[in-house]
Amino acid sequence: LQPDSYETITNKALELTKVEKYTDAFATIEKAIRLKPDYPQAWNTKGDILINLGKLNGAIKAYNMTIKIIPDSDAFEIPRLGKIKYQALNKKGLAFVRNEQFENAAAEFEKALKIDPNSYATWLNKGLAEVRIGKLEEALTAFDRATTLKPDSYEALNYKGFVLEDLGRLQEAVFTFDKAVKVNQNFIAALNNKGLVLDKLGKHEEAIEAYNSAIQANPTFDAAWLNMACTYSLLGERDNMLNSLKKAIDLNPRYKMTLQQIPDFQNYRNDPEFLKLSGR
């Protein structure tokens, strides 16, 4: 490559980005764009630099230029151009997420997946965006695709379990959280979530087992201690409830402020020991 070619200048901007010299990188990529305004990689790089500078709206505009320059026909027929357009669509979606424009984000991820339908990360991000706009069935489809592409993704399985719970499909949610735990036995979030769903199903003893497993994996997991206290309260096991609650508060003193509002503790709201723990 010629030292003053637009490709060379774009590569220089990329190198400056790697060493976090974003202001210099921005000035450099602007030179490349002036030399070749229809060079999609330069616009993609500009978008990346603007993301790192915290200028999300500018980044979205830069990615839009990449998307505009590469026709859909070329994106589907020419792998190199398809990859660049896919990256621009995906990164534009991520920028929308950071701007909390989740509907726009989901739409961009959808477009990106038409170019590369086998991207685990994009299916996962699409699912998360759909959850934020309340489209649970679409989110479930996205998480299903993510777990098909990457069956050992306990993260995607956990999100899928959340959606199933919100859809009222509680037994399926428990099964899905179990799958996440089989992949990662120390995945405390899935163990805790499994316990919460089991409580909803009235399976309180099994819920206790799930919370205990989470605590064994991480004894400082305050949410599991609190949830276990709630379950012991529902079972009428006062001493176990108080012991678990004390541990939760020791780990997270902010719980004191909300104890009186938690319905599961209604039978103990006037209990002297409970009142002491809640700071009354």
Feature map (PLM): residue ranges:
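Short coil loop/turn residues that delineate tetratricopeptide repeat
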Residues: D4, D38, D72, N118, ...
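Conserved alpha-helical positions within TPR/SEL1-like repeat arrays
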Residues: E7-T17, Q41-N52, I78, K83-R98, ...
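TPR/TPR-like (Sel1-like) alpha-helical repeat modules
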Residues: Y63-P71, S233, R238-Y255
